[in-house]
Amino acid sequence: MRLYELSFAQIEDFFYKLAEVKDIIKDSGLMEFLPELKKLDSTIQTGTTRVKHAFPIFQKGGVVMDITNVQQAQIAEEAGAVAVMVLDKLPYDVRKSGGVARMADPKIIGEVMNSITIPVMAKVRIGHYYEAKLLEALGVDMIDESEVLTPADEEHHINKWEFSVPFVNGARNLGEALRRTVEGASMIRTKGEAGTGNVSEAVKHMKIINSEIRSLISMSEEDRVKKAREYQVPYQLVELTAKIKRLPIVNFAAGGIATPADAALMMWLGADGLFVGSGIFKSQDPDERAKAVVLAAACWEYPEIVLEAQKMISEQKSMMGIDIKSLKPEELLQVRGL
């Protein structure tokens, strides 16, 4: 059976069961006595393509929170975040401070890794191969090649196939999402407009991606070939996307999510999970807001629970948002890395 004949849910279920079996074998002590299993365990650690694409599946339905220090990382873990993303500055502060935004201090990333048990991700500049190599050597669980940081290469993204660690990339539309997939990304996130506390761009980008996938489904083979040329991706990837009626890799929402209602909205629109940046730790109630956003993301199908999550926070303590229309074209982060 070919991969594209399986549903995304079947693939997801397979990886969950595979992880459960591996844990049972390790807990039983059989790994030491069965050389082939031990060899398999060692192979799994090297970051094969299957493992890199499976890792984001385990984050589905959850919230990844941007943090800058150990204290924030611990708040995120306590709130139920599935992972943290380490930055030097939160996106709101990156936007306000200007200058060149780079990878976070490896010492801080290491301290965060040693202080929590959930996965730790970190951002690199678009096209900055060596920042990514440093994070791989450091042992982070995932790398975000992010438009929030100042691009190192205005023309090209990193070739992610050369790495053992999975990557996440931003996208505003289906063409961008599929190009990043061809480059080796294991996860896509809507770009939105980071650091604004304004979810409108994330909504727009998610709707564009969904709409373009629906268009693919109804297209003739000839039109899909033309679309593959337009997107600059292999036809087989376009065909696969139409076949499974979604992106072939996990698609999270990001950019401007600041409240439990925002979180539930993006999940309702079809996001597999969420990245929440400045919305948590630029608010005046980060502990409560972190828990509320996680609850809303997990229970988005139940408005009464999302309502309780919304009651956990105070709108008066939300971060000061930025109207997208007030930003100059050169101030938009989403246009970086097409």
Swiss-Prot record:
Transmembrane domains' residue ranges: none
Keyword annotations from UniProtKB, A to Z = Lyase, Pyridoxal phosphate, Schiff base
> Which family does the record claim for this protein?
Belongs to the PdxS/SNZ family.
**Matching CDD domains, A to Z?**
pdxS (cd04727)
Subunit field text: In the presence of PdxT, forms a dodecamer of heterodimers.
Q: Does the keyword Lyase apply?
A: yes
Output the InterPro entries linked to this UniProt entry: Aldolase_TIM (IPR013785), PdxS/SNZ (IPR001852), PdxS/SNZ_N (IPR033755), RibuloseP-bd_barrel (IPR011060)
Instruction: Name any one GO molecular function.
Output: pyridoxal 5'-phosphate synthase (glutamine hydrolysing) activity
Q: Briefly, what is this protein's role? A: Catalyzes the formation of pyridoxal 5'-phosphate from ribose 5-phosphate (RBP), glyceraldehyde 3-phosphate (G3P) and ammonia. The ammonia is provided by the PdxT subunit. Can also use ribulose 5-phosphate and dihydroxyacetone phosphate as substrates, resulting from enzyme-catalyzed isomerization of RBP and G3P, respectively.
Residues holding D-ribose 5-phosphate: D66, G195, G256, G277, S278
Q: Name one GO biological process term.
A: pyridoxine biosynthetic process
Which residues of this UniProt protein bind D-glyceraldehyde 3-phosphate? Answer: K207
Q: Which residues form the active site?
A: K123 (schiff-base intermediate with d-ribose 5-phosphate)
- Asked whether the keyword Nucleotidyltransferase is assigned, the reply is no
**HAMAP family in the record:** PdxS (MF_01824)
Gene designation: pdxS
Q: In which pathway does it act?
A: Cofactor biosynthesis; pyridoxal 5'-phosphate biosynthesis
A Pfam family (short name) is SOR_SNZ
EC number(s) recorded for this UniProt protein: 4.3.3.6
Could you identify this protein by its name? Pyridoxal 5'-phosphate synthase subunit PdxS
